């Protein structure tokens, strides 16, 4: 007895493969768009007197051009690595230069500030929130959903995250 495959079985196998490949592609596309479209927030150490900051002042802090808050505390910006997709929005809006130049700006801002850098880079939102909570004068840029009670949310240009017109809104 000779067994032969049905002519459409190969096509059915290819169809399953293409459906699975399409599913993977859609998942990856959604993941990338979520990473790029995240809403960011500014948070500060609770002992920090800063509850609101203008956009030009945020740019100065980000570039290490502001050394002290009005209350005299040293300024430290804590952020995720400029190479992470989560920071794309921040780089575009605040630094307005390519990632490689942002790294140069950060290195220049930190030059001569041993022990108290102008800008600190961390690996995760959780680490960022913990650093901001533990360093007086610290301010951080974090995914809005990583905020917890250990830090204070800072208004940017008079707006809180998720309010219409907020400058670090991801979409």
Predicted features, each with a name:
Residues 5-7, 30, 57:
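Exposed boundary/loop context
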């Amino acid at each position: 007895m000779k067994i032969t495959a049905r002519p459409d079985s190969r096509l059915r196998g290819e169809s399953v493969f293409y459906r699975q490949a399409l599913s993977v592609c859609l998942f990856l596309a959604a993941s990338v768009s979520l990473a790029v479209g995240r809403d960011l927030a500014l948070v500060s150490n609770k002992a920090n007197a800063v509850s609101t900051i203008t956009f030009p002042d945020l740019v100065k802090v980000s570039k290490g051009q502001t050394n002290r808050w009005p209350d005299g505390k040293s300024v430290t910006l804590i952020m995720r690595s400029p190479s992470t997709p989560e920071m794309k929005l921040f780089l575009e809006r605040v630094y307005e230069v390519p990632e490689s130049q942002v790294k140069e700006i950060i290195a220049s801002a930190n030059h001569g500030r041993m022990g108290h850098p102008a800008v600190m880079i961390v690996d995760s939102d959780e680490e960022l929130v913990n650093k901001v909570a533990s360093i007086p004068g610290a301010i951080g840029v974090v995914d809005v959903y990583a905020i917890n009670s250990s830090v204070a949310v800072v208004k940017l240009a008079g707006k809180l995250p998720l309010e219409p017109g907020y400058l670090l809104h991801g979409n």
